């Protein structure tokens, strides 16, 4: 059996006339010019770097920080209101679920849903957890860490999502 080996420089996901990143997770965000230029976008795909204007958090990717004093989850949920979000803690996990029904936008009808689950460190004080949504759509889940002599309770409970009027200023590491 003959197998054709192509250098990654010449690989194209759907052929030379289709952008290779149309099906990324940026649904409803629109396209940039380089998304529609197949020779620029798919020809250099293994070495391609996204525009500097799109940050990691713009892509819906969460950021988890755990330092000596607290545990923090930052998640971009700009397409959801606090009523669309459910945050609950069960045992050693925090579950964040977002869903909004089909609604009309500039391009037609769209519905979104996500479900994220994170393991909480064993020394997080589950009775003091908080969750807030900034004006720019950044969900911040915080939990202070307890001293080693104290015992953390492990039961299921919902964490209310409060709305902040100011944009998120992500705490520095």
From Swiss-Prot:
Modification type Deamidated asparagine: residues: 101, 123
Principal subcellular localisation of the protein: cytoplasm
Keywords, alphabetical: Acetylation, Chaperone, Cytoplasm, Disulfide bond, Eye lens protein, Glycoprotein, Metal-binding, Methylation, Nucleus, Phosphoprotein, Zinc
Residues recorded as bearing Deamidated glutamine in the entry: 6, 50, 90, 147
Compositional bias segments (type: Basic and acidic residues): 153-167
Localisation: Cytoplasm; Nucleus
Pfam families linked to this entry: Crystallin, HSP20
Modified residues (N-acetylmethionine): 1
InterPro entries listed in its UniProt record: A-crystallin/Hsp20_dom (IPR002068), Alpha-crystallin/HSP_16 (IPR055269), Alpha-crystallin/sHSP_animal (IPR001436), Alpha-crystallin_N (IPR003090), HSP20-like_chaperone (IPR008978)
A GO-annotated cellular component: cytoplasm
Modified residues (N6-acetyllysine): 99
One Gene Ontology term of the molecular function aspect: structural constituent of eye lens
Binding residue positions for Zn(2+) 1: 100, 102
PTM sites of type Phosphoserine: 45, 122
Region (Disordered): 149-173
Classification via Gene3D superfamilies: 2.60.40.790
Residues carrying sugar: 162
Domain (sHSP) ranges: 52-162
Disulfide bonds: 131-142
Quaternary context: Heteromer composed of three CRYAA and one CRYAB subunits. Inter-subunit bridging via zinc ions enhances stability, which is crucial as there is no protein turn over in the lens. Can also form homodimers and homotetramers (dimers of dimers) which serve as the building blocks of homooligomers. Within homooligomers, the zinc-binding motif is created from residues of 3 different molecules. His-100 and Glu-102 from one molecule are ligands of the zinc ion, and His-107 and His-154 residues from additional molecules complete the site with tetrahedral coordination geometry.
Family indicated by similarity: Belongs to the small heat shock protein (HSP20) family.
Protein name: Alpha-crystallin A chain
Organism: Loxodonta africana
Gene name of this polypeptide: CRYAA
């Amino acid at each position: 059996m003959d197998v054709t080996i192509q250098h990654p420089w010449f690989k194209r996901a759907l052929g030379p006339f289709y952008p290779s990143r149309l099906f990324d997770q940026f649904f409803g965000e629109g396209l940039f010019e380089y998304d529609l230029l197949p020779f620029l976008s798919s020809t250099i795909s293994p070495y391609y770097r996204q525009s500097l204007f799109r940050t990691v958090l713009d892509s819906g990717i969460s950021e988890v920080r755990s330092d000596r004093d607290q545990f923090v989850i930052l998640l971009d949920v700009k397409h959801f209101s606090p009523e669309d979000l459910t945050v609950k803690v069960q045992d050693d996990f925090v579950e964040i679920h977002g869903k909004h029904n089909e609604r009309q936008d500039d391009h037609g009808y769209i519905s979104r849903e996500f479900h994220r689950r994170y393991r909480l460190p064993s020394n997080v004080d589950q009775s003091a957890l908080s969750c807030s949504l900034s004006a720019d759509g950044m969900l911040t889940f915080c939990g202070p860490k307890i001293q080693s002599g104290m015992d953390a309770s492990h039961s299921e409970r919902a964490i209310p999502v409060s709305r902040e009027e100011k944009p998120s200023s992500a705490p520095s590491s």
